[in-house]
A protein has these predicted regions:
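ATP/NTP phosphate-donor binding region
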Residues: 1-91, 354
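Fold-independent oxyanion-binding glycine-rich loops
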Residues: 10-11, 17-18, 38-40, 68, ...
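A short, small-residue-rich loop immediately preceding and capping a beta-strand
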Residues: 84-124, 130-138, 280
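A glycine/threonine-rich phosphate-anchoring loop and its flanking beta-alpha core
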Residues: 112-213, 218-219, 316-321
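Short alpha-helical scaffolding segments that buttress acidic/His motifs in well-ordered protein cores
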Residues: 196-200, 258-266, 280, 300, ...
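Active-site segments that bind and position negatively charged phosphate/pyrophosphate groups
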Residues: 208-340
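C-terminal charged capping/lid subdomain of soluble metabolic enzymes
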Residues: 315, 325-419
Length: 419
């Protein structure tokens, strides 16, 4: 097998307790007129006021858009851009969860290149560099602070849509785990499940044949040597800290490990991409109105079970990273990986079935059909997917029956796009 490594990320990442205090200096080096994107909750906190003070103290004029909604409705891109027109920002700062950072990235595209957000849906449709973005996450989950994608919700489409381009990667990510200490247990669990899904789906994604054009023709190239390194780091950190961060919110060591794990997951997914769990969650979330992380967390063990025949070595490596004994056989370790993931997610209150999430039984086939429309995610799965196989996964996840997905390895189960 020819080795391939593809890794994309910010110009700089500052990680650690207290790194938020560099915000003023970092931003002032990029511009003098900042548009700050955040949500109403964080925008009303003392921490937010202090951060704005850092910007102003560094001589940066600040315009605040504090109305970011979960899953970023696409109309908010135009709304935010209109609010900032008079201020003429030359740097955009996203403060908050992944939605706040995603909006900052999408607005930077529109402010730079004009048009509507919908003009840039898909991969590689952003024509050039954008206004620099500084990302300051307050949750340990999406990894958006280092990724080349902004995910939006468009009422004209059932599933979420993405703007994917290396130009969307923030210039600077300030990852301060102290900002996650106020994250309540339910949100810690949801975003933590999302982070776990990122490292696992990136590590088990399709491996495409190596070519000189691969990284220029795709944003998400599939698993490779560099993303694998970040994925394994992420799974080790998240597996060892998610439950503690959920049950002991003031445990700073757990919060640090979760944020570093989530950022590692962002690096992994930012070049490798995610797969079936994300494809299925989009229509599930549209129907049940449940958080993205809860949905992908619910689905993840079932997708791992389905992909097991094509990814035994990878699942074994994940099990070892999660602390499984190294002397077990690869098949035993693969089973342990799936069991350990399911147990960890259950321990922080993630529902184990789609029925618990509220997906109606008469929507199972429809869910599979909609998931199949997420072509990028479907193509990134290590086993080939069609509507019937997606429905098989959905039905198993609805009933809570992982055993329905168990099969032995067979050559024809792996994707023809590369194993």
């Amino acid at each position: 097998m020819s080795m391939l490594g593809v890794l994309r990320g910010p110009r700089q990442v500052l990680f650690g307790a207290g790194q938020r205090h560099a915000l003023g200096t970092v931003t002032a080096a990029l511009g003098s007129r900042a548009l700050v994107c955040t949500d109403a909750r964080f925008g009303g906190t003392r921490e937010f006021a202090d951060l704005v003070g850092l910007l102003e103290g560094a001589g940066v004029r600040v315009t605040v858009f504090a109305e970011v909604l979960p899953d970023v409705p696409v109309h908010q891109v135009a709304q935010c851009a209109a609010v900032s027109t008079e201020a003429d920002p030359d740097v955009v700062v996203g403060m908050g969860g992944g939605s706040c950072i995603d909006l900052a990235k999408a607005v930077a595209v529109v402010l730079t290149h004009g048009g509507q957000a919908s003009d840039y849906y898909g991969e590689l449709r952003v024509p050039g560099p954008v206004i620099p973005v500084v990302a300051l996450p307050t949750t340990a989950g999406t990894g958006s602070e280092v990724t080349p994608v902004a995910v939006l919700t468009d009422p004209e489409r059932i599933s979420k849509v993405g703007i994917s381009s290396p130009h969307l990667i923030p210039h600077t990510a300030l990852c301060d785990p102290e900002l996650t200490l106020a994250c309540p247990p339910a949100l810690t669990a949801s975003v933590g499940a999302d982070a776990l899904s990122h490292v696992i789906e990136a590590f088990t994604a399709v491996r495409r044949p190596v070519s000189a054009a691969l990284a220029t023709e795709r944003v998400f190239v599939g698993k490779n040597e560099l993303t694998d390194t970040f994925a394994l780091l992420g799974v080790r950190l998240i597996a060892g800290s998610l439950h503690r961060a959920w049950s002991e919110p003031d445990d700073m060591q757990a919060r640090e490990s979760m944020m570093l794990g989530a950022t590692a997951g962002g690096f992994a997914l930012g070049s490798a991409g995610t797969a079936a769990a994300h494809a299925i969650q989009y229509p599930v979330g549209a129907v049940t109105h449940t958080p993205h992380g809860v949905g992908v967390g619910c689905l993840l063990p079932y997708v791992m079970e389905f992909n097991r025949p094509a990814r035994v070595p990878e699942l074994a490596a994940l099990a070892r990273a999660m602390g499984a004994p190294a002397d077990a056989t690869p098949d035993e370790l693969a089973d342990q990986a799936i069991d350990r993931v399911a147990e960890l997610l259950a321990s922080v209150g993630i529902p184990s079935t789609l029925a618990e999430l509220g997906l109606p039984a008469d929507k199972l086939r429809w869910t599979a059909e909609q998931a199949f429309g997420a072509e990028r995610l479907v193509a990134n799965n290590p086993r080939q997917l069609d509507v019937d196989t997606l429905e098989h996964i959905v039905r198993a996840a609805h009933a809570g029956d992982r055993s329905a997905l168990r099969q032995s390895a067979a050559p024809d189960l792996t994707s023809t796009k590369g194993a």
